[in-house]
């Protein structure tokens, strides 16, 4: 799927991420990372990796000049998400690849938010990571991760003497692997529907005057970059965010939508039902509030993982009723 020579599965997405970073970095090495990434990855790089002498500079991944300025002679890894969690910033993977090659560092891309829609390896990434838990499995009933890369890297990860994937123990069991493989066979169908539904909701929410962020909207700052990188038939992905002003309104809306069976208030994504959460107090809660504000988080931010609803117009009209009911519209 990602076009790499081989891959290695793990017991979780974080099992894949941490193994790669520990394999690529030694004590004294340096990482340049996007500042808007999954909270668990941020916590690992910010709080855990320094225990081993690995330090990280967090930068605006959309600012290529700032990224290049952050690179030092100790930098070994440039890390980003193809579409960031949860602010949906889009990485210019071709531009990042040029920088990585210029300084002989590894470009590692987490592609969890955009499987099939974006192919990081084709665009120049050295290593591609997924949380299999999300879109690829698609049914929120198991946990897994995968590292896709060159044979040499995967062999090193599996080495019984010094391989991080082997020695840290985050191995996937065979039953989980078989279950995910079964669901993988419908990913191409599911991603088209996720993208179709997300695009519809994004346009409707925007037309209603709600602050909406979705890479498929021309108003998105990186719309052109995503469009230039995408595999067109799979669309712009199933993730979008809206800002309803306050956390109280966000919680009231999510609770009412769940009550009306429009989806679930949950921190995962890629499920066949729509999932919604307030990232600042959930998936990004590891990031201090002052840093969240610097990154562009707001209290009223709601992240939607749009489901596979057959009648998305009906879903939207029901969501709009909920928004009117709680005073958002």
Locations of regions flagged by a protein language model:
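Conserved small-domain helix->loop->beta segment predominantly found in fold-type I
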Residues: 199-273, 287-293
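PLP-dependent enzyme catalytic core of the Aspartate aminotransferase-like
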Residues: 46, 69, 247-248, 255, ...
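A common structural junction motif
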Residues: 165-166, 257-269, 321-329
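FAD-binding core of FAD-dependent oxidoreductases
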Residues: 135-141, 176, 267-280
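Short, well-ordered beta-strand elements within core beta-sheets of diverse protein domains
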Residues: 180-189, 237-245, 303-307
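Conserved PLP-enzyme active-site core in the AAT-like
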Residues: 4-213
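Short, flexible turn/loop "capping" segments at secondary-structure junctions
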Residues: 138, 172-174, 231-234, 295-299
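Glycine-rich phosphate-binding segment of PLP-dependent enzymes
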Residues: 1
């Amino acid at each position: 799927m990602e076009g790499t020579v081989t891959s290695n599965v793990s017991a979780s997405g974080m099992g894949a991420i941490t193994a790669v970073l520990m394999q690529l970095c030694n004590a004294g090495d340096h990482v340049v990372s996007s500042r808007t990434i999954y909270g668990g990855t941020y916590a690992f790089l910010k709080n855990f990796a320094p225990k081993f002498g690995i330090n990280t500079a967090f930068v605006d991944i959309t600012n290529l000049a700032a990224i290049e300025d952050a690179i030092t002679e100790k930098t070994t890894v440039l890390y980003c998400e193809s579409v960031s969690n949860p602010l949906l910033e889009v990485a210019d993977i071709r531009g990042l690849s040029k920088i990585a090659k210029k300084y002989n560092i590894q470009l590692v891309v987490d592609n969890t938010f955009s499987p099939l829609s974006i192919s990081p390896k084709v665009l120049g990434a050295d290593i591609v990571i997924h949380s299999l838990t999300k879109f690829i499995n698609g049914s929120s009933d198991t946990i897994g991760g995968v590292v896709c890369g060159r044979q040499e890297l995967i062999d090193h990860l599996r080495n019984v003497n010094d391989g991080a994937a082997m020695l840290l123990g985050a191995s996937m069991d065979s039953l989980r692997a078989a279950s995910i493989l079964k669901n993988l066979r419908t990913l191409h169908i599911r991603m088209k529907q996720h993208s179709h539904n997300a695009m519809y909701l994004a346009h409707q929410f925007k037309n209603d005057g709600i602050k909406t962020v979705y890479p498929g909207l021309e108003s998105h700052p990186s719309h052109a970059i995503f469009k230039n990188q995408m595999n067109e038939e799979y669309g712009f992905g199933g993730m979008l965010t809206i800002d309803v002003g306050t956390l109280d309104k966000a919680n009231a809306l999510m609770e009412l939508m769940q009550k009306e069976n429009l989806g679930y208030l949950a921190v995962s994504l890629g499920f066949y039902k729509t999932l919604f959460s307030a990232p600042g107090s959930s998936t990004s809660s590891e990031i201090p509030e002052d840093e969240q504000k610097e990154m562009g988080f707001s209290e009223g931010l709601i992240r939607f993982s749009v489901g596979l609803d057959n009648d998305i117009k009906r879903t939207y009209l029901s969501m709009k009723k909920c928004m009117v009911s709680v005073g958002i519209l």
